[in-house]
Structures are given as C-alpha cells and as structure tokens.
Amino acid sequence: MKSLLYPAIALMNRLSFGMKFSLISVLFFVPMGVTNFYLLKQAYEEFQVTRIELQGLDLLSQSFKLRQDVQSYYDLVQINAIIISSTGGRSSELDSQIAALEASIGQALQALSPASNDDEAIQIFVAKRDEMLSMLKAAKAEAVPLGKVEFVEKLQSSSLLFSKLISTQSYLAQDADVELRQLTELIIAYTPRVAALLSDARATSAAAMGQKMLDSGMAGKLDMLMGDMEKMHAEYGLALDEAVQRVPKLAEVLGSSANDSLAALKSIPELVDGQVIMAAELVAPWKDIYALIGEGVEKSYRLDAAVMDLLQSELSERLISKRNQMILLLVALSAVFLIIVYLYGAFYVSTRSSLKGLGTIMHKVAGGDMTVRFDAKSQDELGELGEVFNGSVAQIRQLIERVG
C-alpha cells in the first residue's frame, strides 16, 4: 500500500503544510464548484424554458385569433367572388365585413412579436410574419375577385403553419411532459383541420345560397367535404379519446367542449344536406346558413380556448415550482459550500494553532524549562502527539530529579 502511495507521499513531503492544504482545497473545491454551476444552470434553463412556453402560449393564443379572422376572411372573400360572378353585383355589407377583417388581420400581424430569445428563431418568425403581411397587402390590392381568393387562400394556409411555428419555437411541441405535448398536438394538429373543414362547408353553402343555385362544382365540393368530415369525425374522436386517457382531468376541465366540437362534424353535414344539397330551392339569405354552420366552427374555437386555459394553468404552476426548486437548490448548495469552507478553514486554523503551540513548548523545553506542559485542545492525532510529548517531558523531569 505504501509503495502505491509513494509518489503522492514524495510530493507531500516536498510541500509545506500550507501548500498541502491549498493543493487539496483546489482539488476539492474546483470540481465541487463546477458541479454546482451545472446543477444551477440546468435548473435555470428549465425555469427559462417554462417561462418561454408561457410567453409562447400567449403568442399562440394571438395566432389562433388571427387564424380565426383569416378563416372568416377567406370564407367571405370566396362568397363575395361567387356572388359577383353569378349576379354581377356587389354587396356593400360583404365589402364592409371584408374591409374590417383586413384591418383587424393587419393590426394583429403587426402586433405579433417572437417569444424565443434565439436570433435564428427570431429571424424565421419575423420573415414569416412579414410574408403574411405581404400576402395581406397583395390581397387588399387585388381588384379581381377570383385573384383575391387565391391570395387569401395562401394567407389562410400560412396562418395554419404560423401556429405550428410558434408551438415549435416556444418549446410547447417538444415539452418533456407527455400530457402537455398531447394537449398541444390536439390544438395544433386536429382542431385547426376540423375548423377548416367546417369553414369550407360554410363558405360553399353560403355561396350557393348567395347565387340562389347549387351548381355541379359546388355540389361536388360539398359531397367531398361531407366525406372528409366523416373521416375526420373518426380520426378526431380517437385523438380526443387518447388525450383524455393520457390526461384524465381533461374530460372534467373541458366539460362539453370536446363533445360539442366532435358532434359538429356530424351535425353540420346533416344541416348542409338538408338545407342546401337536398333543398328544392335556395331562397334563404346566405347569412342564415353562414351563421348556422358558424356555430359549429365556434365549437372548435371554444375547445381551443378551453385547452389553452388548461395549458396556462399547468405551465403557471410549473413555473412557480421550477422557480422554487431553483431558489432552494441555490440556497442548499450555497449553504453546503459555506459550511464546508467554514469547517475547512476552522480545521486549518486549529491545526496551525496546535502546531504553533507545540513548537513553542518544545522551544521552552530546549531552553531547559522542564515544567512546561502542552495543553492539547484537539482530540485528533495532534492532541495524542501532545499527550505523548507531555509524557516524555515528565519522564525527563523525573530522570533529572533522580540524578539531582
């Protein structure tokens, strides 16, 4: 064993006590400090991610409102284009609604700001937002109704992708919690598709009512939409069931919002079939069918809002928890570090004091004073050495007394 330790013993024998102590202190405190730093860094990063997710949730809510306005804008532009092409006249009410939505969408886009702190993510966000502003500007400037529809269709597709971009940049889509990812997927991947299908049915049905006839093109489109809604009903139902299974409290929190949104995929096709496809004549105002189907679309939006409220609650609780964990970790690590430094320093001072005291006593003994005694205050090996020294001095004193 001694041969194994010989290199270290040789090194220590070359160093003074202070140098030995300093070397051991460096080898102990540097790794400890690095470890504490990374523990605190990890806790802070988790706190920051949660805060960005909360900020991203507010931004996602704004993008949902934007998407709803863009969807309504797209529907009204389609209806307006078909009415103009079939009747040759314009509706001042439609024009005013479209103009109001254009102003609202423009203001909403300009108010959006990225939640991420990453420069590359900010550039991507700003580029996508500016692209949508350019699309809106082009749509507003387009005088041909069908040309306007094409621009708004691109804007509508971009609004869907924009929500996905926000969920990715704010870490909601990559969250470590499976339940939170499930909820995010529900409002990013499913409810937008449901709302888009219902909105397409709303626009096509209202346009047919507006031109007072259902031509073959519209009839074919409605048949296709009804088939898509039937498929979506099954897929959407499975997604909702899976979400409820993974997040048991989801059913209680959402209440009837999920069932209402799912039921709309059944009730709207029946409504369209009865009032548009199978109707003997289309005499009702287009606004009536638009409002009726719009109620089904609103059910999906209400589900989005309910899920967003749940996410807001979960992330707010997590943010408080992460902040408390970070503070407790900082306090605990600091306390441990300070206690170690305090005890380490006390050990150094105690050892130095014992060695100095022993040296002083030995100096007096060397001067001939055999009456001195080393007062050992420590109970360690130095204390034992002091007791041995006292015994040796006592024996020497006895020998001197015998000789005398």
Regions found by a protein language model. Give the residues of each.
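Hydrophobic alpha-helical segments
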Residues: 1-337, 341-352
